[in-house]
Amino acid sequence: MVREVRENELDDLLELYLYLHEKSVPEMTEHLKETWDTILHDRNHHMIVNEVDGKIVSSCVCVIIPNLTRNIRPYALIENVVTNEAYRGKGYATACLNYAKELAKQSNCYKMMLLTGSKKEETFSFYRHAGYNHADKTAFIQWLE
């Protein structure tokens, strides 16, 4: 079942992020709690999860960003697309991305964007199959410390 994350599912989400790029689950600090609270109460920040048999197996983040161009239409940024390795290839992440797409449409977004750090062809194929292309724009990243 695809839905938005519940407040009591932070630990489950952090465990899932171990399949993304995290090396360990962060310690439950005041900063982490405040960040979680900020995310949960931001109407433009959507933490989407796919639950199978009571377990969160896939997730993505969809942030709706207000915009003054394109006829004052917002755009959506997708981040942290991840699926538990044991559940990959079954459409769970695609379902999360489709949920994000519906949220973006409901918000009248004119586009959705995502970046991937992967250089694997199967990752590119996955995103192309989900409706994304890498030909229209060029991304530049500046990492901040």
Predicted regions mapped to residue ranges:
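Conserved acetyl-CoA-binding loop-helix of GNAT-fold acetyltransferases
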Residues: 80-83, 89-102, 129
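Conserved GNAT-fold acetyl-CoA-binding loop/helix
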Residues: 14-37
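A short helix-loop-beta-strand connector motif used in the catalytic cores of GNAT acetyltransferases and
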Residues: 37-49, 77
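Conserved beta-strand-loop-alpha-helix junction that forms the acyl-donor binding cleft
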Residues: 113-123, 141, 145
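A short beta-loop-alpha structural element at the N-terminal edge
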Residues: 1-13, 26
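Conserved GNAT acetyl-CoA-binding A-motif
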Residues: 97, 104-116
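Conserved beta-strand in the GNAT
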Residues: 49, 55-64, 77, 82
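Conserved glycine-rich acetyl-CoA-binding loop
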Residues: 71, 84-95, 107, 119-124
